[in-house]
A protein has these predicted regions:
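Active-site cofactor/cluster-binding pocket
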Residues: 1-147
């Protein structure tokens, strides 16, 4: 399979923030548009606040890879606090991008990204969800920013 036929996305969040739900919603939307998809979470202790990782593969052809994603095209960080305890840029392709839920600008957050030199996008998903939805559901604006 040509790697350009497949987009791989890795999500980082905490239990209860909706990263898994956003991942699965993206898979459903891509499937509904005729794509082949995978969407699955990986997490340890099932408790609110524990770090979780979720993965998407979206392709025009059948996805024959069945493993975690180690070299994603995109990384979505739903909880900025994870940047200091998880290597969110691990394996991220140089021509990819990272989307981070933060009040900081891309220039302000870049020093925390362990030397990553690719595209950095930031969005204050907590503020947006509080203003629009009335509660902190950061997964919703993060999903919109990803699409």
């Amino acid at each position: 399979m040509n790697q350009r036929d497949m987009v791989e996305i890795r999500w980082h969040g905490r239990g209860g923030q909706g990263a898994k739900t956003a991942c699965l919603l993206l898979a459903d939307a891509a499937f509904s548009s005729g794509k082949y998809v995978q969407g699955f979470p990986e997490y340890g202790p099932e408790r609110s606040g524990a770090p979780i990782t979720a993965y998407n593969r979206i392709s025009n052809t059948r996805c024959t890879i069945h493993s975690n994603i180690y070299e994603p095209d995109y990384v979505v960080v739903v909880d900025e606090g994870l940047i200091d305890c998880v290597d969110v840029t691990a394996g991220l392709k140089a021509d990819g991008a990272i989307i981070i839920n933060t009040k900081k600008s891309p220039e302000e957050i870049r020093p925390q990204l362990r030397g990553y030199t690719g595209r950095v996008c930031t969005i204050d998903a907590n503020r947006i969800s509080a203003e629009i939805l009335g509660k902190a559901y950061p997964n919703t604006p993060m999903l919109a920013a990803t699409v």
